Amino acid sequence: MERLILNKLLDWKNSPYRKPLILKGVRQVGKTWVLKEFGRRYYENTAYFNFDENEEYKQFFETTKDVDRILQNLMLASGQKIVPEKTLIIFDEVQDCPKVINSMKYFCENAPQYHIACAGSLLGIALAKPSSFPVGKVNFMQIDPMTFTEFLLANGDENLAKYLESVDTIEPIHDAFFNPLYEKLKMYYVTGGMPEPVLMWTEARDVSAMQEALSGIIGAYERDFAKHPNISEFPKISMIWKSIPSQLARENKKFIYKVVKEGARAREYEDALQWLVDARLVHKVYRSTAPGLPVAAYDDLSAFKIYLVDVGLLRRLAQLAPTAFGEGNRLFTEFKGALTENYVLQTLITQFEVVPRYWSQNNPPYEVDFLIQRENDIFPVEVKSEANTTSKSLKKFKELFPDKVKLRVRFSLDNLKLDDDVLNIPLFMADQADRLIGLALEQKNSKSSCRF
């Protein structure tokens, strides 16, 4: 299995400004595997310490702040060798170990020669507490579910993955590539990007095992809900989680608390929702009132949409059977195209630094699915789950903000093309959106300069 984050980890290893690393990511997204694989590839050895399996290791951090003594105790207790610069030290399951997290300050200041990477489930929750980590003394990195490109690599389709990365001009994709990529994307909607379900499909072609793996992950997340410090929030978190398919099945996907429970109010459920956001199990996309910078200044905090961390988990949570794979475009269009919108949001979050927003207006109603910030430009994005689409909302957006729109972006089942200032990106190329937008801007500017 190939994870593209390994390249980022190598950059971290080689950086002259390297600090201890905290790798964030949801449960079972592949944090431990990635760090061990990184150590195997690029270090002489790896020293792995799991604080859930060996709770006694925590004591070494509670009795001293001397990093040499801490490492000596860990080596003696575990029998593992640690050599500066040559050993990758992995501290795993550190979410309940504030002393371990805080010790990164001393490793950064007093022992930068040691390469240390920390990981843990629900780290977003732990790090949301002000005193839980040493500000400025660690590097952060986020690992997300496998992208469609990574899915292709895991499935043995290196040729298709290389082709996607080789596209360097905005022109239609040949049928020899378009058709198989379209079929592979349908399968990605079924498996999602969590490594275990992907493995069940790519290595064993076992649909039942894949379904069980997805159910197991969902079950693990639901058990984590009980870890909220205020136990009364547990049922609220669970109700919000289970309402997500219903929220996304509506024509207007704005999150409504009444869908969670009849009569529910924001003040009763907002803490529970924030727990899910901090855990990164859901993504919260605010409504923007206008395409301005900074984007947060234009947020309507009372209006937002919620998406799941992974499209495969959403399919499983919605109880949509894998047999939909063989039913034409059903996976793309089912419950108002929610899977497609969730999939596109996943890809945008990994490519752009600023979390996407959406835009809408009433009377008459128009909605642009996402607004993305690329450098200092805002691009409206529309997601269509079918081919031969029209973009009324993109047209309206340009009418209202003509000076703010350099390019409009549409994801659909249509082929790659640039039609005036509308860039259509096939859904299977969503991973390449940032690069394709850059190519489209160059192509558009080149045409403009040729007119003079």
Regions found by a protein language model. Give the residues of each.
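Conserved lysine of the Walker
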Residues: 31
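Short regulatory helix/loop adjacent to the ATP-binding pocket of P-loop NTPases
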Residues: 124-140, 152-157
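Interdomain hinge/linker elements that couple catalytic modules in large macromolecular machines
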Residues: 153-346, 356-363
